[in-house]
From Swiss-Prot:
Molecular function terms, GO-annotated: nicotinate-nucleotide-dimethylbenzimidazole phosphoribosyltransferase activity
Pfam families: DBI_PRT
Family annotation (HAMAP family): UPF0284
Origin superkingdom: Archaea
Xref: Gene3D superfamilies: 3.40.50.10210
Protein name: UPF0284 protein M1627_0030
TM spans (from-to): none
Family in the record: Belongs to the UPF0284 family.
Organism: Saccharolobus islandicus (strain M.16.27) (Sulfolobus islandicus)
Length: 347
């Protein structure tokens, strides 16, 4: 089942599409307690590369196993790979600025890893590189596709998303989600408030100060693409949509955010109000993982992880193509079972 918000319609998704995964890192993820998108703060810099490797290969090369939270909850890349296995679209990994680059073929936007937003996230040179090169990528994809789905992987990305939305004038404080069921709102607020001090007046310079390479790469690819776009992600994609709207006020009519029920139902965030402020449509997958055989998968129903790597959008695409909830969960369990059998993953 798929829920539609703000005029979103699933019929636009009945097309062949390409899956674009934009990866990057921000040093904000090194702040203790801010994100659980990795077993330790230091390992969060390996998460995007490992996510990309797993989606494409079914195994990771940059680390020994798939990224997990400190309590062993698996990366949403597992859900993405399971969903896309029923469709088999073209998959492209785009490096917007990852500290660890994946050991697979990828497109490089000539960006840089994001630094601590409390000081300066990105240089203007790299901001321009990311935007210009991703626009060109979107233009090239337009030659082959009428629809693309863009996912993201960047630990601490909800914090940089909140800073980005606030810097662009939206009411976003405390409204973004977290990979943890215990959203570290006070810490996020403290980091973001410090980042927003002495902001420059120019919007692009504001983004260089407080944003991250992935948001810019997602926005640029969308700006260059001529067809319909499914931004596969949660509150981070509302920030990407806000950047898109800053550059082109007419573009959002072609854009829908595709996410999970765990994002739209998150009591500690308000993704739908952010989407409404920005003016972007939303679809949410009602995928139910409570029937999974594995505790690590069922944990998603308790508010862990929630979204990432295009998990919600990928589930939506599978459901649109007629894959049932039970069939999709069985596939997720099958893939997770293979990983558990070959590693020391928690179950």
């Amino acid at each position: 089942m798929i829920k539609e918000y703000y005029g979103a319609e699933t019929f636009i998704l009945n097309k062949d599409f390409a899956y674009i995964l934009v990866i990057g890192t921000t040093d904000v993820s090194l702040i203790p307690g801010l994100t659980i998108a990795g077993a330790t703060p230091e390992l969060t810099h390996f998460t995007p590369a490992a996510d990309a490797e797993y989606v494409l290969l079914g195994k990771c090369k940059s680390i020994n196993t798939i990224p997990v939270s400190p309590t062993g909850i698996p990366t949403p890349a597992l859900l993405t790979r399971a969903s896309l296995s029923f469709i088999n679209p073209l998959k492209i990994v785009v490096n917007a600025g990852s500290r660890i680059v994946p050991k697979i073929p990828y497109i490089d936007l000539q960006g840089e890893p994001g630094k601590d937003i409390r000081k300066q996230a990105l240089s203007m040179e790299k901001v321009n590189n990311i935007i210009e090169n991703s626009i060109k990528l979107g233009e090239e994809l337009s030659n082959e596709y009428e629809l693309i789905m863009i996912g993201e992987s960047i630990p601490a990305g909800t914090t940089t998303a909140m800073a980005t939305l606030l810097a662009l004038g939206y009411d976003a404080m405390d409204k973004v989600s977290s990979a943890s069921p215990d959203n570290p709102k006070e810490l996020k607020r403290k980091v973001v408030e410090e980042a927003l001090r002495n902001l420059p007046t120019d919007p692009l310079q504001r983004l260089a100060k407080v944003s991250d390479p992935v948001l810019l790469g997602v926005a640029g690819t969308s700006l260059g693409f001529k067809g319909k776009i499914l931004l596969a992600g949660g509150t981070q994609m509302t920030a990407a949509a806000a950047i898109i709207n800053e550059f082109d006020k007419n573009k959002l009519k072609d854009i829908t955010i595709g996410t999970t029920k765990w994002i739209v139902e998150d009591k500690f965030a308000d993704m739908l109000s952010l989407a409404k402020q920005v003016g972007v449509k939303v679809l949410a997958s009602m995928l139910d993982l409570s029937i999974s055989a594995y505790e690590g998968i069922r944990a998603y129903e308790k508010g862990y992880v929630k979204e990432g790597v295009g998990a919600g959008g990928s589930a939506i695409m599978a459901l649109v193509k007629g894959v049932s909830n039970n069939t999709l969960v069985r596939k997720i369990d099958e893939l997770y079972g293979e990983l558990v059998g070959s590693s020391n993953l928690h179950i």
